Amino acid sequence: MNRIESVFSRLKSQDKAALIPFITAGDPDSATTVALMHQLTRSGVDLIELGVPFSDPMADGPTIQRSSERALKHHISLKDVLAMVAQFRKMNQSTPVVLMGYANPIEAMGYKRFVEEASRSGVDGVLVVDYPPEESAEWVRHLKDQGIDPIFLLSPTTPESRVKHVAELAKGYVYYVSLKGVTGASHLDLQDVSSKLSQLRAHIRIPIGVGFGIRDEQTARSIAERADAVVIGSRIVEEIEHSQAADLLANVGALVESLRHAIDARSNHSSDIG
Amino acid sequence: MKMYDLPDKRGHFGPYGGTFVAETLISALDELCKQYEYYRGDAEFQTEFFRELKHYVGRPSPIYHARRWSDHLGGAQILLKREDLNHTGAHKINNTVGQALLARRMGKSRIIAETGAGQHGVASATVAARYGMECVVYMGSEDVKRQATNVYRMKLLGATVIPVDSGSRTLKDALNEAMRDWVTNVGNTYYIIGTVAGPHPYPMMVRDFQAVIGNEARQQMQEEYGRQPDALIACVGGGSNAIGLFYPYIGEENVRMIGVEAAGKGIDTQKHAATLVTGRPGVLHGNRTYLIQDENGQIIETHSISAGLDYPGVGPEHAWLKDCGRAEYVAITDGEALAAFHALCRFEGIMPALESSHALAYAAKLAPTLRKDQLLLVNLSGRGDKDMATVAQQSGISL
């Protein structure tokens, strides 16, 4: 069982939803990222999505775009991100790390070299925003060769035929984008999320995480009542942006603890995965 | 050469093109593919498109023999395909008319566009006014400054211009922002991409609408000169005017096709936009193509005196035509383009856009190496009125 499976299987036995934060590697600087990852695990997260900064983050809103720009000021490269994961792994063997980013830094490194180095660094999954399943056959083969899970996005507009296609390719978990638009937007319809998740579960046999538009404890709890994992990105990145260096770990830690508390307080959990 | 039938069903030109977008955009693109597939074969749609090109755009655009300039250069004869005479002053309108007609049939009431030089923005605002649609144009704030006149033109036409302050504040950032708008408002919104880049079906669809340039040229050359030109020359930013001219000629292998990119301050400096000449393949803005990028795959800011060529990618069909050797790609500096701008003004009484001046500058280099009976057909893709301030500034004059 790999790290991602272990985490979800433990959570299932505890009847809990996973808390997945997103941070951009190198934001605000490379020295902070590994410390921040350890802080996140201490504050109770189950898996970390680590953003690979890119110059043109088309699917992200202004908050995450700015975090990318901050990281790129320090010239953080994909190689640097992998080094951060390796550094994190020296102290932490159990928390899965999923890289999330855009295709071109991986294209520049080459599939083969990337998956080998990612595997060596202790990366557990990779989500490439602009590799939809149609363009992913070779990419997924390379990932699976190295035992890395290909994570895919599903959206409110994904038709059933594509859900089936994603179900065949995806491993680890799938990431349901709970609203139309970019990261950091805010108009989440819980009714929609519930009905869409039950449709997805007809085909998807692995855990389903929900992200985009989750900005407060109450929404996090409501999502936790419906999904297997709650992904929180822009809200955490905002906390990083607005914190002074000296308070950054404490501020993010406090925010994450409150979210953890909220999602563990969920009721009526009706997940029927596995 | 075997029959050229690219792209494939998923929009691939060899290894290039495709649909490299986030899941949230896929269903909108699928819908667009389906609708365009239907209407490209629909006689009534095509009839309306060509009627609009004739009566609204003013097509066909003539081929003009630049005789005095050719004599001065002392070699091949330079012929100009006069896209600058189109309504709104550039080739861009061929495409926006086509896409606006499609948007109407798809029941969309709002169109959005990205623009660099402002020509595509003006062409989009124009058709939005013509067909009674709401129009929002995204433009890098740097370009807003460089192209103040075009910004005002768009506003006069009723469009809302939104300056984009992220990244390098140029065309690529405007494109990112337009994609974001589309993802958010896909229900009532149609995204008019202005060039042959982006995810499938845009590179194919924009090419098809712009192919009127090459199709007319083939007929006009036959009628007026009794033969086809020895070479086609067109500037390449994203590459829509070049593909429009080249595409109908791909099967005619004795016609050379030359795409001219912006060498800016020189391709050995960091300040250029010569994507095919200096770049490496990668993925950006929905397609795999050549990109100007650093060794880590980050996109590098480009530079050109002409905002319309200032883009770090290029249409995937050009990437393919380069790799298979059917087309050649070269680069022209800011200075060479300016010299060609002035030459055309003085020798022919035609003020070319700075974008088109790159193609003219290469023609001026090539012509003297050829015989006097050889013919170079240059796509004069736009007129230069919009560039007046830039040209004056280069001469130390403030208007």
UniProtKB/Swiss-Prot annotation, chain B:
Signal sequence segment: none
InterPro entries in alphabetical order: Trp_synth_b_CS (IPR006653), Trp_synth_beta (IPR006654), Trp_synth_beta/beta-like (IPR023026), TrpB-like_PALP (IPR001926), TrpB-like_PALP_sf (IPR036052)
GO cellular component: cytoplasm
KW NAD (keyword) present: no
Keywords: Amino-acid biosynthesis, Aromatic amino acid biosynthesis, Lyase, Pyridoxal phosphate, Tryptophan biosynthesis
Keyword Repressor appears in the UniProt entry: no
PROSITE patterns reported in the protein's UniProt record: TRP_SYNTHASE_BETA
EC number annotated for this UniProt entry: 4.2.1.20
Cofactor(s) listed in the protein's UniProt record: pyridoxal 5'-phosphate
N6-(pyridoxal phosphate)lysine: residues bearing it: 92
NCBIfam families in the record: trpB (TIGR00263)
Function, in words: The beta subunit is responsible for the synthesis of L-tryptophan from indole and L-serine.
Name of this chain's protein: Tryptophan synthase beta chain
Source species: Nitrosomonas eutropha (strain DSM 101675 / C91 / Nm57)
Gene name of the encoded protein: trpB
